[in-house]
Amino acid sequence: MEAHQFIKAHGITTAIEQAALAAANSALANAVVVRPFLSHQQIEILINLMQPRQLVFRPEVFWNHPIQRVIHNELELYCRARSGRCLEIGAHPRSINDNPNVVHRCFLLPVGRDVQRWYTAPTRGPAANCRRSALRGLPAVDRTYCLDGFSGCNFPAETGIALYSLHDMSPSDVAEAMFRHGMTRLYAALHLPPEVLLPPGTYRTASYLLIHDGRRVVVTYEGDTSAGYNHDVSNLRSWIRTTKVTGDHPLVIERVRAIGCHFVLLLTAAPEPSPMPYVPYPRSTEVYVRSIFGPGGTPSLFPTSCSTKSTFHAVPAHIWDRLMLFGATLDDQAFCCSRLMTYLRGISYKVTVGTLVANEGWNASEDALTAVITAAYLTICHQRYLRTQAISKGMRRLEREHAQKFITPLYSWLFEKSGRDYIPGRQLEFYAQCRRWLSAGFHLDPRVLVFDESAPCRCRTAIRKALSKFCCFMKWLGQECTCFLQPAEGVVGDQGHDNEAYEGSDVDPAESAISDISGSYVVPGTALQPLYQALDLPAEIVARAGRLTATVKVSQVDGRIDCETLLGNKTFRTSFVDGAVLEANGPERYNLSFDASQSTMAAGPFSLTYAASAAGLEVRYVAAGLDHRAVFAPGVSPRSAPGEVTAFCSALYRFNREAQRHSLTGNLWFHPEGLIGLFAPFSPGHVWESANPFCGESTLYTRTWSEVDAVSSPARPDLGLMSEPSIPSRAATPTLAVLLPPPAPDPPPPPSAPALDEPASGATAGAPAITHQTARHRRLLFTYPDGSKVFAGSLFESTCTWLVNASNVDHRPGGGLCHAFYQRYPASFDAASFVMRDGAAAYTLTPRPIIHAVAPDYRLEHNPKRLEAAYRETCSRLGTAAYSLLGTGIYQVPIGPSFDAWERNHRPGDELYLPELAARWFEANRPTRPTLTITEDVARTANLAIELDSATDVGRACAGCRVTPGVVQYQFTAGVPGSGKSRSITQADVDVVVVPTRELRNAWRRRGFAAFNPHTAARVTQGRRVVIDEAPSLPPHLLLLHMQRAATVHLLGDPNQIPAIDFEHAGLVPAIRPDLGPTSWWHVTHRCPADVCELIRGAYPMIQTTSRVLRSLFWGEPAVGQKLVFTQAAKAANPGSVTVHEAQGATYTETTIIATADARGLIQSSRAHAIVALTRHTEKFVIIDAPGLLREVGISDAIVNNFFLAGGEIGHQRPSVIPRGNPDANVDTLAAFPPSCQISAFHQLAEELGHRPVPVAAVLPPCPELEQGLLYLPQGLTACDSVVTFELTDIVHCRMAAPNQRKAVLSTLVGRYGRRTKLYNASHSDVRDSLARFIPAIGPVQVTTCELYELVEAMVEKGQDGSAVLELDLCNRDVSRITFFQKDCNKFTTGETIAHGKVGQGISAWSKTFCALFGPWFRAIEKAILALLPQGVFYGDAFDDTVFSAAVAAAKASMVFENDFSEFDSTQNNFSLGLECAIMEECGMPQWLIRLYHLIRSAWILQAPKESLRGFWKKHSGEPGTLLWNTVWNMAVITHCYDFRDFQVAAFKGDDSIVLCSEYRQSPGAAVLIAGCGLKLKVDFRPIGLYAGVVVAPGLGALPDVVRFAGRLTEKNWGPGPERAEQLRLAVSDFLRKLTNVAQMCVDVVSRVYGVSPGLVHNLIGMLQAVADGKAHFTESVKPVLDLTNSILCRVE
């Protein structure tokens, strides 16, 4: 029971109160402790589910499934307490070490999510052996566990427990397994939601969302952050309905504990099970209302006309009960559907009166409302009809009874009443109720369900056969079958063949035999030394290969050679088939040409022939002029040393990667078995089979994994007679990172092929019994730029690596395309052979690479996101894949959405096969390339430009050429500089290349292309395939001419670089410049170094680089390499240089840019020139910028130099941005607050706070005495003595000051920073040890370019550039200047606002040089601190407000400890500075940088506009790291000075801090620190506190501070322009957005913390609503400033 209200009752005067207190104490003593953080909704759900148990909430952990896990833990305690020493089924890996009473545990080999659970299992104790066996597939090392599952184990045990591990077993299967174990009792915890009894659909209850698709059910509870339960529907129905098992293994099933729909079942072996009826859901809060219409509006209640099942909707029971009561009691004249709908609308709104919920409400969908109205109206009509009939027939019956004589009543009284069947008030059945009759009702009430069914044991085959036949007979009649004997393979038949991709299965003809070279051969590396030298391999690899010897096992079947290479402790597999793709380390592609009849192989410049001889296998290698023969003897070689093998693999990998980075064309990627193998250097279909099942290809070249001497290679399936090549049965890595060869194409069948009555020798059951061979009839419809193709035809004609099956969610044989796959590849549906799962998709390599993809069933629900995911989940592979349109068959997904999803989620080279219907749709909606429309005006202008060009010597080739109006299709490949756009073009793809410059033309011609400049190309582009390089920089009239004349045109270029320049200044170029949209963007550059990428990231946000050069920009060094200039005049003055425009598209190793003063206008007007200049080099770029032109566009050397000087590195770290979102209007209590009067709200605020209008704007208090330092005064102290403001009200609620007054600035300088500092010389170790409670030891911190980028980004957002950052020269005053300003933002107060007598507040600003020097370090340290913060500790603003509010709401029983520092900055001294430096040293900051920081902080000069102060120590609020070090010092003081009991939450931001705890006390060492540093602490301890603009209310959350926000608006100047008024409106709108769901709660809480009336807060919210609506009223006021300062005394020191 909920008894909090009785715990604090004062005085017990009655027996009722005594009983209540005893009940409360007993409930709390036996309460369930809830440890996870929960939302309000989750707390309400748990309280309702766990009744009558008392709950105690002590949040300290975050769980993915908090509700289920709390219930699970409670039921687990119950089961373990009653089972004693027992056998456990499917134990969670984390629970193994905690339960020593378990004598044996039954597991299954982990798949899917179970693998993750085993990875997080303990690595010590009993769990270690279980973990090792499960992850490595090893047998059990002792009898305490097994991996055979409950059904496959026979360990004897009398008692067992199963915690949520029997959902995939039926009661009959469990009965047999218990008999096998000799088990008499089994405690089983199961999740049995009642919705599984309903037809497929989506059901949302107050606790969870259930998705039921007919076979599987997925349950996700409120607030879950990952996937929920996923169970088989038939098994869940069996567990709900069954109370006993009969047969040879009888059982009694009793429900001994229930929490919601979570049950503990006690299964007891009993010889004669007796009836045990039970009501499973007596406390169900939902009623399921049946819709008369099914999906899509089809009638669903009449099976003779439609087989669609009914649709049900979950409706709150109170809604249905009230609706029935209202409708059944209405007067006949008043009853109508309209009144019923009005009443339903009324009770669906939630109504709260104070804390009393008057109406719970219901948030329903349109479909649910329609179904409820229909069902309620018809049900009430039926009841009214029954009532009318009952009264009518009853009256007639009464008339007949009273008309009887005396004898008849006496006979009835004597004989009928004495019968045992007599029940007073029993009604006659007027109608026989059938479940599909409308009169049977429309709703299912789980509260009245009663079950008592028996399940026969599986061993009773006679009963099974009889039930199966009866089931089939009922299906033949067209009735629904609820039999649990559904076939495992699903429904197959003619009704499933609605996909045109389905084809028949024919028998392949026998193929001619090929000479066999199968056997085992010894391959020494010394025999291949000449070949290695011809391959130009490094001497290190040649030497290491010479010391190794491999054993190669060859298997040749059907013109295919499979090799298994044993090299030391590693095993490699390769498959040689004709057309196999060979992996390359460059852009060139290599395909293997293999002729088994001629015994030859060739690819690129390499070829070989082989033949069997008496001495073994003789191979002849031909490569790079080499003709070498080698003979390999049969046998098995001794195993090479594992260390030598690993060293060879590592060296070979480094060589491949080096060639991949630096080679322009590339070569073969050499694998170990490709060099030390029979058919070197080929290794198609390379697969490494590791001894460790979780050791992938990425670890082949490292020593990360322990090297095992004995390697057991997995069994290879025998090769049957099938058309696709066989693939090894196990994947190389868990992620399928293997390059599989494409299947060999099917040869056309001979005219008369004899049928095969049995498979060839060697075929096993694992191979398909029926194979096929079909001629190709596919038709190419479209080709995409990435090489993907769309065909009309059959999927099985594809030669892609993978075939994608349109599977169901269970991956069982079905209809349509799935049935066609089952006929061809039945072994591919074996779940045990699935090598990987990605979402719902399953990958298998048996008998060939196949992906079973799962599309959504659009008959149930349209789910575009699931459709996108179905295609996306098939892309976790290497190689190409062949698709059909997923879901367009049985699942009725429209063709258009499925095709669009494939377009967005496929990989280059994939193929899509369409049936005829989809092909006709595709041809009608064929995707087209981008088009450029040439209008008559553009054509006329272009022809004018061509005429002007043809009159020059350069343009004579264009004479007579014309551009005509029309439409031009084009392909435009855009990319970042150096992305390889030009290198992607091959000679076979193009006839003519058009380039803008001579340098580019020569470069293309050196590669063998026919390249021309834009003018001369006019003679050769007609009807040719044309590629235009650097297209944006071509003169637009020539670009249009070549695009229109070419047969096909492919544009290359970068839209961000230099466009075409109008050299003639005739205005024709900008008039006709075409707007070209790129068809593809390339973001990876192979040219630009890392620092250049960071500089140009603003123009290319997604740029990445493969360059290993980190820094390439240098200033002030001598010129190197190619010189670049901006103007022709500079080119003439620097011989050998080229302009940036001429260098566009070129690549140089080293370049030098010379910026001259005459290029200022060019650079400022065209940033593209700077981008082109920066992106021409690969190694080094020297900048000679005497005029400082590049600094003006943001290219500064000081920022980069200072960053590397401070120890920065190139790299990436976690960004500092915290993602935040706007709260959804789920409660929207703010809508209940109408706009109110601004004047009345502010007057009420003044009345409640006691503030009154004053005739002055501010008071200048007397200036304090200067206690330390030296003050420099201005000559004159005259200033304005009045203030003009546009204000919301004339009463302010802030501590007002005069920031524009010179005397006010002097008072602040002296009063804040001229006070004497109290020094404290002590060790920092004690305070650092105390601080470790919140900030543990940090360790070395890495400062990367990520922090530098964030710093520059912050500068740019403030409108700053790098010009203010100077070289680090401490002799330069501009480097170390600290500027001082007076704050114009005053502090909200409930006290005195004018005559407060306090000096103002100041803010300082360090130089941009120091900010850029220390800023990246402080950002990196802050990130490290955030990563180490304990749970429940919040720092600054680095968290989402909802997370902080949830943590506060979870700390229900806490008080709020608040501390307010007075003069926080002024009291910081040498001790606080020393603590900062100690933490910097702990983080690895360079010593010189720490000493520099200490020097700047210990002695400084604050430079005000007309004053300055030389002082010592203190803290300046505007220096870099202000928030960081203020917060750290705040944490250190609080944790060192105070001890907290029942600590829950702590938050620190600058000098503001709160701690949520039950009580606190001052620690023993606090007085020393407080007195030594002169700290001024003001501590408050109360139920509700204030922190950083929010009200902290434990148990409720962090609420916006309405009073403070409204009060701070009163001191602002909101004029004179309309911009300030708009800023006010936006600020108020943002604040109101935070009040969306908590407005009413804020009224109660904020009024309590400030001691004001709730009506004031209500009125203030209404006032803010009016301001947000743009209805703010401003008043202009002129108020004087009262000067109370005396003459300032000058003291000479």
UniProtKB/Swiss-Prot annotation:
Location of region: Hinge: 712-778
RNA-directed RNA polymerase: annotated segments: 1207-1693
Organism: Hepatitis E virus genotype 1 (isolate Human/Myanmar/HEVNE8L) (HEV-1)
UniProt-annotated stretches for the region Y-domain: 241-439
S-S pairs: 434-481
Location (main, coarse): host cell
InterPro entries membership: (+)RNA_virus_helicase_core_dom, Alphavirus-like_MT_dom, DNA/RNA_pol_sf, Hepatitis-E_Cys-pept, Hepatitis-E_hinge, Hepeviridae_RdRp, Macro_dom, Macro_dom-like
Residue segments, region NTPase/helicase: 960-1204
Gene Ontology CC: one annotated term: host cell perinuclear region of cytoplasm
Cofactor details (free text): For methyltransferase activity.
Subunit structure: The protease domain interacts with host EIF2AK4 (via C-terminus); this interaction inhibits dimerization of EIF2AK4 and prevents EIF2AK4-mediated phosphorylation of host EIF2A.
List of residues binding ATP: 975-982
Entries under PROSITE patterns matching the protein: ALPHAVIRUS_MT, MACRO, PSRV_HELICASE, RDRP_SSRNA_POS
Domain Macro: 775-921
Described purpose of this protein according to its UniProt entry: Methyltransferase: Displays a capping enzyme activity. This function is necessary since all viral RNAs are synthesized in the cytoplasm, and host capping enzymes are restricted to the nucleus. The enzymatic reaction involves a covalent link between 7-methyl-GMP and the methyltransferase, whereas eukaryotic capping enzymes form a covalent complex only with GMP. Methyltransferase catalyzes transfer of a methyl group from S-adenosylmethionine to GTP and GDP to yield m(7)GTP or m(7)GDP. GDP is a better substrate than GTP. Y-domain: Indispensable for virus replication.
Repeat in keyword set: no
Domain RdRp catalytic, first and last residues per copy: 1454-1565
Record key words, sorted: ATP-binding, Disulfide bond, Helicase, Host cytoplasm, Hydrolase, Magnesium, Metal-binding, Methyltransferase, Nucleotide-binding, Nucleotidyltransferase, Protease, RNA-binding, RNA-directed RNA polymerase, Thiol protease, Transferase, Viral RNA replication, Zinc
Residues that, per the record, bind Zn(2+): 671, 673, 686
Chain residue ranges for the region called Methyltransferase: 60-240
Region named Disordered: 737-769
Annotated stretches, region: Putative protease: 442-509
Name of this protein: Non-structural polyprotein pORF1
GO biological process: DNA-templated transcription; methylation; mRNA modification; proteolysis; RNA processing; viral protein processing; viral RNA genome replication
